[in-house]
Amino acid sequence: MSLEVWREITAEYNGKIIKSSFKFIDGKVDVRTQHGSKTDQLGGRTPEQVAKTLLRELAREGRA
């Protein structure tokens, strides 16, 4: 059994700072908020870059 480590991430969206948590396991980044979640692969980016992108997408969808 592996330990999941969640880290805090912040991003700016429409002039507001939004916060969430993300984990990076097996080449995938998972971002979760109280209202939703998104997962994506690195694709040459750092886990932090992917997490910020996913968090902004969740905010755009009204789920952050």
Regions found by a protein language model. Name each.
Residues 2-34:
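N-terminal acidic leader/helix
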Residues 36-64:
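Mixed-charge, Lys/Arg-enriched low-complexity segments
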